[in-house]
């Protein structure tokens, strides 16, 4: 089978003779769409791309119907990185940063000191799950590896890369005991697949996924599953923005319009879409007329 063209997808794979599974992610267009909406400094672009790759890997690895949200927060130059990806594999991301405090060669600990990582699963049905851990690692790959070793108690490794407008990621995880009942054999097998993944060079990340996996594991029986496409999509809308005004109450919403000189502007932090509401729009919202009239948006 030939390599897939550059696109956006996740692809699961499994080692037929080992208790190990893997997941690969490639993000080109969706990552480019996020970067096109903001003028992020290079270190922010890299971290946001890596977080997007990690989020897509987790959506590909988990079984749920809903939304997965990853947030990395700190009191440093990058106070927030946030990525959302739905079970339909629609992804968006954003960052907040202090441009004058960011240097090109800054490390993760310098950009996000005393940071923490929060994973939220918001299912369509059922209870919301949220877990938070410290950003414990020299880079995001190490942080996610440490997170999942703590939470799932299964050997797990992440490799994340964002460069040249492309984001990539590789996840390896040891499966529960099945094909290899012997403890020593299981550990040797795990160390084998990890050691080969560690040989990945920065310039190899943008090669075709099948070429790369074959190069790493050509001596193993690796079975690839069907790809799962991803795409950028922002869930903001004029209706949601109008609902935010309604939640303020009629008196406060009208007062806000007056304070803003006659027009309230609501900006989407993800896609930079801007929604405008004047006094007549707000009156219509509370009269039950919805958001159909004067539905002006700007980029």
UniProtKB/Swiss-Prot annotation:
Posttranslational mods: Under oxidizing conditions two disulfide bonds are formed involving the reactive cysteines. Under reducing conditions zinc is bound to the reactive cysteines and the protein is inactive.
**GO CC: one term?**
cytoplasm
A biological process (GO) annotation for this entry?
Answer: protein refolding
Q: Which UniProt keywords apply?
A: Chaperone, Cytoplasm, Disulfide bond, Redox-active center, Zinc
**Matching Pfam families:** HSP33
| Domain of life, source organism | Bacteria
The disulfide bridges present are 234-236, 268-271
Q: Does the keyword Protease apply?
A: no
Please give the Gene Ontology molecular function terms for this protein.
protein folding chaperone; unfolded protein binding
> SUPFAM superfamilies from the entry?
Hsp33 domain, HSP33 redox switch-like
User: Where does this one sit in the cell?
Assistant: Cytoplasm
What family does the entry list?
Belongs to the HSP33 family.
Briefly state the protein's biological role.
Redox regulated molecular chaperone. Protects both thermally unfolding and oxidatively damaged proteins from irreversible aggregation. Plays an important role in the bacterial defense system toward oxidative stress.
For this protein, the record's HAMAP family field holds: HslO
Protein name as annotated: 33 kDa chaperonin
